[in-house]
């Protein structure tokens, strides 16, 4: 077996991130260019106590699917990119609002799907064949034991 230990310091491809931000802005999509994601085991919503803890740690997005997938993609010498469709304010962030429901999340997610499709199709048209900023394609070479 081949054992690799790629760095996770910069999890996502800087070149694809730059393209996603540029394309999203061109399409008029609200883009948050950076942020820190905390990944929880799901599928579930976080508790108020967890949400307060995550907020106090400075994490901006709670996600159930951003990891380990991105790390595994890097192990395959591919360029990982995360595009999160924000669906709700977390339970611990906004005063005494009622907790979010699955129904509400699905409604917001479905309303975002058209933007996601437009973004992805436009990005695919513009992904450069030769990448000169990222080193994603060198992960195996640089991290095999």
Which stretches of residues belong to each language-model region?
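Glycine-rich phosphate- or other oxyanion-binding loops that anchor nucleotides, phosphorylated ligands
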Residues: 1-91, 103-110, 114, 119-145
């Amino acid at each position: 077996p081949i054992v690799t230990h790629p760095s996770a310091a910069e999890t996502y491809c800087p070149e694809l991130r730059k393209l996603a931000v540029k394309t999203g802005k061109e399409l008029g999509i609200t883009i948050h260019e950076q942020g820190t994601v905390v990944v929880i085991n799901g599928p579930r919503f976080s508790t108020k106590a967890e949400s307060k803890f995550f907020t106090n740690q400075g994490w901006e997005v709670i996600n159930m699917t951003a990891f380990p997938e991105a790390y595994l993609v890097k192990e395959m010498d591919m360029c990982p990119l995360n595009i999160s469709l924000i669906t709700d304010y977390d339970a611990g962030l906004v005063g005494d609002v009622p907790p979010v429901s699955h129904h509400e999340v699905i409604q917001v997610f479905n309303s975002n799907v058209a933007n996601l499709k437009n973004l992805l199709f436009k990005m695919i048209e513009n992904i450069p064949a030769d990448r000169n900023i990222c080193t994603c394609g060198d992960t195996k070479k640089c991290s095999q034991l």
